[in-house]
Regions:
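Glycine-rich, histidine-containing beta strand-loop boundary motifs that form or position
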Residues: 4-6, 121, 193-194
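A short, polar/charged loop/turn motif at coil->beta-strand junctions and beta-hairpin connectors
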Residues: 70, 92, 152-154
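Polysaccharide-binding surfaces and accessory modules of carbohydrate-active proteins
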Residues: 1-89, 96, 105-107
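Terminal connector regions
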Residues: 124-157, 164
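A residue-level signal for beta-strand positions that form part of recognition/binding surfaces
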Residues: 73, 116, 157
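Short Pro-Gly-centered flexible turn/kink motifs
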Residues: 109-128
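Aromatic-lined carbohydrate-binding/catalytic grooves of carbohydrate-active enzymes
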Residues: 151-199
Length: 199
């Protein structure tokens, strides 16, 4: 039985890094938090069953002097949208280890004879030109290798989302009227947002 499954584990000979991660909430997504790596276990994690704007499955180890345009940074980005864990740990000799993978808080997977288990991918990026170069590398990697479909390199359809127009005060007729008006304006896609509450 598997009770811990990490996608990446890196070790550094010193702890002279800051841990950077992104946190947030509704209407204030992707806030940057930068804290020194310390002699303790530090983690960025989600146990909500999904990754989200609360805690993104992404972290950076940045040298103390690293900024947007200079300095060494190591990015860890999990391609995973469930319970995740990215943790740092420093031992008595100042050796730093960082692990990234499935959150083991309630993880247990029984493997039968001959079966295998694949952990989520963790995309690691190194830059000696700061956070900006790391970000641009991730953007290129994801646009070329993760984005799929016919719209990968084309403009996507213009859409109208029903939420701001009617919130939860909707009827079938209101939604049809919105969709008809949107079509007359050339809007190509109508998103029924929160219509699953029922009418």
């Amino acid at each position: 039985k598997l009770t811990r499954a990490m996608s990446a584990s890196l070790q550094f000979p010193d702890k002279d890094f800051d841990l950077i991660h992104l946190h947030g909430a509704w209407a204030r997504e992707f806030n940057v938090e930068r804290t020194p790596v310390m002699h303790t276990t530090q983690s960025v994690q989600s146990f909500r069953g999904s990754s989200s704007h609360l805690h993104n499955p992404f972290a950076v180890l940045a040298r103390k002097d690293a900024g947007e345009d200079s300095g060494e940074v190591y990015g860890l980005s999990l391609i995973y949208s469930s319970n995740f864990l990215i943790e740092t740990d420093v031992d008595a000799f100042d050796t730093l280890r960082v692990n990234a993978g499935i959150n083991d808080r309630a993880f247990a997977w029984t493997l039968q004879s001959g079966e295998s288990f694949a952990t989520p991918e963790c995309v690691l990026v190194y830059s000696d030109k700061g956070l900006g170069e790391m970000s641009r590398t991730y953007h290129k990697l994801y646009r070329r290798n993760l984005a799929r479909g016919k719209y990968r390199d084309k403009a996507r359809p213009v859409l109208l989302n029903s939420w701001e127009g009617v919130y939860m005060d909707f009827t079938g007729e209101k939604l049809k009227s919105m969709a008809r008006c949107a079509a007359k304006l050339g809007i190509e896609l109508f998103v029924l947002d929160d219509g699953w509450f029922g009418a």
